[in-house]
Amino acid sequence: MRTELLSKLYDDFGIDQLPHTQHGVTSDRLGKLYEKYILDIFKDIESLKKYNTNAFPQEKDISSKLLKALNLDLDNIIDVSSSDTDLGRTIAGGSPKTDATIRFTFHNQSSRLVPLNIKHSSKKKVSIAEYDVETICTGVGISDGELKELIRKHQNDQSAKLFTPVQKQRLTELLEPYRERFIRWCVTLRAEKSEGNILHPDLLIRFQVIDREYVDVTIKNIDDYVSDRIAEGSKARKPGFGTGLNWTYASGSKAKKMQFKG
């Protein structure tokens, strides 16, 4: 629902003035709007304490889920700030997966920087990565060989429809030792575990937005997300070749990039 805070943001971003035919523009603005929603809730310690009360049930739900995902207790926090600037660039010069950051300061004067990846969608799964096979394999640590060529075939064919049953089985088997690194890289651009590195998110925030309206939010730390995807990929039919991700192609890339949804 549109709370007082969320209603103000909808006004600020002019969402209701956008024609319903402008899907791309609307999606972009909603993306920025929901990033700002998080930034405002965690703007400072006064805002966080205010919105973590029963007077603001929706914002309390969001802030409580975020703190729980980080295993943090509000009583131990003496200061908080949020930002969406100075997020840095990847080694390749591109934008990181981080959309915003929150910094918590605790009673013992230590602090913790939490990079966030924030998305909104009406769908259960959203696009988390769109890269070519060379970039993917380099990032995950997959060397030249059968596994890499099977991934390349998926990219070139833009699906697994032309795979034989044996090729599907081989891709699943060969990818199994890399599953954790593969999933982690897709959502953070780093195959190894990381914490507090501004280039690599520690939390995934997924707003469910249907017909432009807030419905719910899911917030997970990276370890829990990876575990959930592996559990999904371990089901009998081995979805996503054991990764639990949807493998598809990047629109307009002409078989030069793959896209993963999760």
Swiss-Prot record:
The entry's keywords: Endonuclease, Hydrolase, Nuclease, Restriction system
E.C. number: 3.1.21.4
An annotated GO BP: DNA restriction-modification system
GO molecular function term, any single one: type II site-specific deoxyribonuclease activity
One Pfam entry name: Endonuc-MspI
Enzyme class at the top of the EC tree: hydrolase
Catalytic reaction list: Endonucleolytic cleavage of DNA to give specific double-stranded fragments with terminal 5'-phosphates
Taxonomic superkingdom: Bacteria
Keyword Membrane attributed: no
Protein name, UniProt field: Type II restriction enzyme MspI
Gene that this polypeptide is encoded by: mspIR
